[in-house]
Amino acid sequence: MPKMKSHRGAAKRFKLTGSGLVKHYPSNKHHKNTHKKENRIRALKRNLVLSKSFQKNIREILPH
């Protein structure tokens, strides 16, 4: 039986926590930030946890 491989695009964007939750880095932070409020940019710095419905999909393509 062949090895199970991780989806490489998903592996670069999502991380599994020790408790099994899926973290991701939010979008809209990389450029064109001059018109965005400082509070919004600060809030986009932290990693967010995906909702349960999306976590199920990501765990299927990230077996390791």
From Swiss-Prot:
What domain of life does the native source organism fall in?
A: Bacteria
* Keyword Membrane tagged: no
GO biological process: one example: translation
**What's in the GO CC field?**
cytosolic large ribosomal subunit
Q: Which UniProt keywords apply?
A: Ribonucleoprotein, Ribosomal protein
MF terms (GO), sorted A to Z: structural constituent of ribosome
Q: Which PROSITE patterns match?
A: RIBOSOMAL_L35
Q: Which cysteines are joined by disulfide bonds?
A: none
Q: Where is the composition biased (Basic residues)?
A: 26-39
InterPro entries in UniProt: Ribosomal_bL35, Ribosomal_bL35-like, Ribosomal_bL35_CS, Ribosomal_bL35_sf
Q: Disordered: where is this region?
A: 18-39
The residue stretches assigned to a coiled coil in this entry are none
Question: Which family, according to UniProt?
Answer: Belongs to the bacterial ribosomal protein bL35 family.
This protein is called Large ribosomal subunit protein bL35
